[in-house]
A protein has these predicted regions:
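Fe-S-dependent hydro-lyases/dehydratases of central metabolism
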Residues: 1-152
Length: 152
């Protein structure tokens, strides 16, 4: 569903949002990412233009794969879900608290404009923070490679 009420496919919607440079967010339930093709699920998420996933909980490997793709995993406080908070997905979201001093597991604010919701940043290690800041593992490796070669 597009903001104007037009019903379309997820893929078509993602293309329109990408064209308008609108980053996307996914609202999810428990154990987000459980399933067999998890690495491709994270790649597909990124390719659709999703910049963050906010879930009640994450499947461990999938959370790591999201980070590896540069997608920010955010977790609702215990017992909270997007449904219990009355979030429909039609809201416009902002994430506050991301900074150069980001710490593993830091609390952030998910804002809908009229509401502020506390979420936990599920970048669980300092290296995951670096991956996220660089746009994922591949970008981190390329930056390190380029940095080393420029020193020579």
């Amino acid at each position: 569903l597009m903001p104007n009420g037009e019903v379309t496919t997820i893929y078509e919607a993602s293309l329109k949002y990408k064209e308008s440079r609108t980053p996307l967010i996914v609202l999810a339930g428990t154990e987000y990412g459980t399933g067999s093709s998890r690495d491709w699920a994270a790649k597909g998420t990124l390719l659709l233009g999703v910049k963050a996933v906010v879930a009640a909980s994450f499947e461990r490997i999938h959370r790591s794969n999201l980070v590896g793709m540069g997608v920010l995993p955010l977790q609702f406080e215990d017992g909270e879900t997007h449904r219990s908070l009355g979030l429909s997905g039609e809201e416009e979201y902002s994430v506050f608290g991301l900074s150069d001093n980001l710490k593993p597991g830091q609390d952030l604010i998910l804002s809908t404009g009229d509401r502020e919701i506390s979420v936990t940043c599920r970048l669980d290690t300092q290296i995951e923070i670096e991956y996220f800041k660089n746009g994922g593992i591949l970008h981190t490796v390329l930056r390190n490679f380029m940095s080393e070669n420029l020193k020579k």
